[in-house]
C-alpha cells in the first residue's frame, strides 16, 4: 500500500525509526526539534495519528517498553523497511516549493528606493548569519572526524548543502543592497 504524494511524514517517521532501531512517539517527536527539524517540520498532533495509521497498515510494530509499560516503542516491520527502501530509491519528480516570506515581501516592493527594502534585506542578513553560525556549530559538533562523516554521510551532505545555501544567500544579499540616495 503506497502513500499519496503529499503525505511525506510516514517516510520521515520510517527513516527516523530505521536510524535508531526503535523509538517511542515522544522520541520521534523530539527528532523534529533537532536534526530532521533543520529541514522538515512536524508536530505532535501530526505524528501520533500517523503512528497509529502506520501500525494499522503494518509498516510499524509496537514493542513494549520493559522500563515503562505505559510507553510504547515502535520499530519497522519488514513491510515498513521495504516501503522506506522503495521511497528512497524513487527519484524526485519536482523541486519543492519554498514558503519564503522574505521573497514574498520583496516581490511586492516595486520601488528600489522604498525604505522597507533596506530593512528587509538587513533583517534577512542577520537571520541568515545566525542560521549559518548555527549550522557551522552543528557541523563542528556532529562531524568532527572522518569516521563521523562516513557513519552519517547523507546527513553530512545535507548539512553541507544547507551551509552552502546560507553562504550563497549572504553573498546575494551583499550584492542587492539598495543604492543610497545622494
Where are these regions (language model features)?
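Heptad-repeat amphipathic alpha-helical coiled-coil interaction surface used
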Residues: 118, 125, 132, 139, ...
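Acidic interhelical loop/turn segments
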Residues: 137-157
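Amphipathic alpha-helical dimerization/coiled-coil segments
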Residues: 86-130
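Basic helix-turn-helix/winged-helix DNA-binding cores
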Residues: 1-97
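Mobile beta-alpha loop/short-helix "lid" or hinge segments that flank ligand
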Residues: 96-104, 135-144
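Long amphipathic alpha-helical coiled-coil segments
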Residues: 179-182
